[in-house]
Swiss-Prot record:
It comes from the Eukaryota. Keywords: Disulfide bond, Secreted, Signal. Residues 1-26 form the signal peptide. It is found in: Secreted. GO terms for biological process: negative regulation of membrane protein ectodomain proteolysis. Disulfide bonds join C27-C96, C29-C122, C40-C146. One of its GO terms (cellular component) is extracellular matrix. Coiled coil: none annotated. Gene3D superfamilies: 2.40.50.120. This is NTR domain-containing protein. Residues 27-146 form the NTR domain.
């Protein structure tokens, strides 16, 4: 009788836990320790500019923020992906979405997909004022710095 009672308790606890616990998503990048230059080299586009949100777009079951940019300088643009200077990023940071403060300058990099330009936390998207001076110097003075 005691054994049956323990079994019922364990089953009840497992049922309650399975209802309470939901799937959690987390952004994880691979490889995890890429340098700025490595991120720059694998991106389809890299530019310096100021972004502003122009809306939300749904693709499948995911929602994306659409940022458009006032571009100061283009460092890399494969396949003329910056003809339309806008890009999508996931609304959720747990899905590697990124945010840009309006009016601030950022280094922005990403990929051209069927849905348009995509940017995320695993690419080189960083406030320009946080980029080290030597990296800025290399980026501006060495045209090969971002090329594979």
């Amino acid at each position: 009788m005691v054994c049956r009672f323990s079994y019922v308790q364990v089953v009840l606890i497992l049922v309650v836990l399975s209802v309470i616990i939901s799937w959690a998503n987390a952004c994880s990048c691979f490889p995890p320790d890429e340098t700025r230059q490595q991120k720059c080299r694998r991106a389809d586009f890299v530019f310096l500019g100021r972004g502003y949100v122009t809306g939300i777009q749904q693709i499948g079951s995911f929602f994306y923020l659409r940022y458009c940019f006032l571009i100061d300088r283009v460092f890399k643009d494969r396949a003329s992906s910056l003809n339309i200077p806008c890009a999508l990023t996931n609304v959720e940071s747990s899905y590697c979405g990124v945010r840009f403060e309006r009016g601030r300058r950022y280094i922005v990099s990403g990929y051209l997909t069927r849905s348009g330009n995509q940017i995320g936390a695993c690419e080189w998207n960083e406030r320009w004022s946080n980029v080290p001076f030597l990296t800025r110097l290399q980026l501006f003075n060495d045209p090969q710095w971002c090329l594979p």
